[in-house]
Amino acid sequence: MQKGIEVDWLLNYRGGSFLIYYNQNIENELKIRGVSYQVVADAKVNLILTEIANPEVNMDIIKLEKTPKIAVYSPKSKLPWDDAVTMVLTYAEIPYDVIYDEEVIGGKLPEYDWLHLHHEDFTGQYGRFWANYRGASWYQDDVRNQENMAKKLGFNKVSQMKLGVAQNIKNFCSGGGFLFAMCSGTDSYDIALAAAGIDICERMFDGDGITPNAQSKLDFSQTFAFQNF
């Protein structure tokens, strides 16, 4: 695509394949990089397209018209686990920028076409680690960094900052941006949106208790995918 060559993405065909016109330079590149490929005749292409067009199969074709500008929502500090998304993108030599709360709150999201996120707790409770790792230096550093950033950006609590991030991401998607979320980035995201305006964080996370009857005050009309949690 960067070289102006048309590419079709064959969704769910052989695990998700790409269809391009034959090009010797591309074939050489595939060989060098160890990418599996198959050269097919026009008749075979027509059979593939016919198979994908069958309404009884869960397949589709998307024409890729531009190289998307990709952002990965990931903390700048080092945590005990690897960021799988950035590892894959780096290995595949796909350009991307790493952004986090400051960039999102600062209005940077509209500069991108695609946003990836995964290991994140948008509720402001620092993931599932408090019970076992609250004494670990990496956990304490993360809490300190998050609290300092919240204050820098004008928020009283980390949970309020994370809600602001979640709402900015929601607006990004409403404006046509693509979001790929996985791991805790999926469910904690909707929990934060549903809990807007109420406090669901216990004292050990933000210094005060939760809003009375917080469960009954969740607004599931604000979520993307989940409800009744």
Sequence positions of predicted segments:
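Intrinsic-disorder/low-complexity accessory segments
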Residues: 1-173, 201, 205-208, 220-228
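A short helix->loop->beta-strand "cap" motif at the edges of active sites that frequently abuts
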Residues: 175-177
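Short, contiguous, pocket-lining structural segments
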Residues: 161, 180-181
